[in-house]
């Protein structure tokens, strides 16, 4: 089992594609959070051991070690190291898990971990020519999905886009369009309810952005992606992305910009400083599944993580499954024997509502779950994400009282 504690966390608002945060570099987005947490946590910066951030793209401004760039941009000491991890959509959660493992092994007492992604600023990329005077050039938009796919893997596993994998899961598990749209509408409604209750005020750090050519700025304080008007009737009018498919722009997560970071440490450092943690990290798990059915990865990861934590699913008070696509979450729930109307499932809405900046989402889920447990006064939460190329990652946390 793991033995690490979540003491604090922040995230930026999640911006829509080409929206308010599109003018901000990903290392600067993460740096804002690192600086604020270092300043306000109550712990000494000298106690920090490392900064670990997840990032999925790493093809542009987020290349050459996002974490190190972000901590330097934040003004943290140069003696503090930083490393960047990539497990695609679960990169942010994997960063938190790596920090928790290090703390549990006694390799440092305090870590900053999370992730960032600016999908708006993802560059176009192309390979160098393999031969002289080549006339073959292929340009990829690195925002999402595969580029430079290995032909041997394509032959073996196919090269389905992420939405196509959502449709694959829908067909395999009998998820129809109405089911998917109902889940999407529920995600929007749950997000709006949490917003109106002020839940997100405790986790969002507003971001100042450029607003004009004359040096004007404005403060971005709220997520841009949610669509409160997206009821079942509105969702039903949207076309499927692929003929005969279930996935639409309305029942899928967005293309977004954002960052999320949590502060983790051992129990003793909190006791020394008189700071009470939000939650204890108990266990984690990562699994592999067929790439064309990548969306079902959370189900196996959740069960394995719960087994390692020594608890049953019915003991869990809050279940966060990242909403890459509605059919994918519904299939996981079906395999787990759960109903999407179960109040434990994504009670504050999910990525269909607030968006999915790939490298940040895992850390966002950890932060939301830790705060959510405090709100509902339940003991355990489980957090999970599906991962492109066929993986699932999960973490189990326990509320600190």
Range-by-range predicted roles:
Residues 11-12, 23-27, 31-32, 40, ...:
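N-terminal extracellular/periplasmic Venus flytrap/periplasmic-binding protein-like
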Residues 24, 55-111, 143-145, 156-161, ...:
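Conserved catalytic cysteine-centered active-site region
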Residues 167, 203, 213, 282-353:
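Active-site pocket-lining segment
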Residues 1-74, 78-81, 165-177, 187, ...:
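Conserved active-site "lid/cap" helical segment
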Residues 86-117, 170-199, 261-268, 333-334, ...:
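Active-site-proximal alpha-helical scaffold in enzymes
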Residues 1-26, 36, 144-145, 149, ...:
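Condensing-enzyme catalytic core mediating Claisen C-C bond formation in acyl metabolism
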């Amino acid at each position: 089992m793991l033995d690490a504690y979540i003491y604090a966390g922040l995230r930026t608002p999640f911006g829509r594609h080409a929206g308010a945060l599109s003018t901000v570099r990903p290392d600067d987005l993460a740096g804002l959070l690192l600086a604020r947490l270092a300043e306000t946590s109550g712990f000494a910066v000298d106690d920090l051991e490392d900064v670990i951030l997840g990032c999925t793209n790493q093809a542009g401004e987020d290349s050459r070690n996002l974490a190190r760039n972000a901590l330097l941009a934040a003004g943290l000491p140069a003696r503090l190291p930083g490393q960047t991890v990539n497990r695609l959509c679960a990169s942010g959660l994997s960063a938190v898990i790596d920090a928790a493992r290090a703390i549990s092994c006694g390799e440092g007492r305090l870590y900053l971990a999370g992730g960032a992604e600016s999908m708006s600023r993802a560059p176009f990329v192309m390979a160098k020519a393999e031969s002289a005077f080549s006339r073959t050039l292929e340009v990829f938009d690195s925002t999402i999905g595969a580029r430079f796919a290995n032909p041997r893997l394509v032959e073996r596993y196919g090269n389905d886009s992420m939405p196509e994998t959502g449709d694959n899961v829908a067909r395999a598990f009998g998820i129809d369009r109405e089911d998917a749209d109902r889940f999407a509408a529920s995600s929007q409604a749950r997000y709006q309810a949490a917003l109106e209750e002020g839940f997100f005020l405790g986790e969002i750090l507003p971001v100042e952005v450029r607003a004009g050519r004359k040096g004007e700025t404005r403060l971005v304080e709220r997520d841009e992606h949610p669509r409160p008007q997206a009821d079942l009737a509105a969702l039903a009018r949207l076309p499927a992305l692929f003929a005969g498919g279930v996935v639409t722009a309305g029942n899928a997560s967005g293309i977004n910009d954002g960052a999320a970071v949590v502060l983790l440490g051992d129990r003793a450092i909190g006791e020394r400083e008189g700071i009470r943690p939000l939650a204890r990290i108990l266990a984690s798990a990562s699994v592999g599944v067929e790439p064309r059915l990548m969306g079902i990865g959370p189900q196996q990861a959740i069960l394995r993580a719960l087994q390692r934590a020594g608890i049953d699913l019915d003991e869990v008070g809050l279940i966060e499954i990242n909403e890459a696509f509605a059919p994918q979450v519904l299939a996981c729930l079906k395999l787990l024997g759960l109903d999407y109307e179960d109040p434990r499932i994504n009670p504050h809405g999910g990525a269909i509502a607030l968006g999915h900046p790939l490298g940040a989402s895992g850390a966002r889920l950890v932060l939301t779950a830790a705060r959510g447990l405090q709100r509902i006064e339940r003991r355990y939460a489980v957090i999970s994400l599906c991962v492109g190329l066929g993986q699932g990652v999960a973490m189990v946390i326990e509320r600190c009282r």
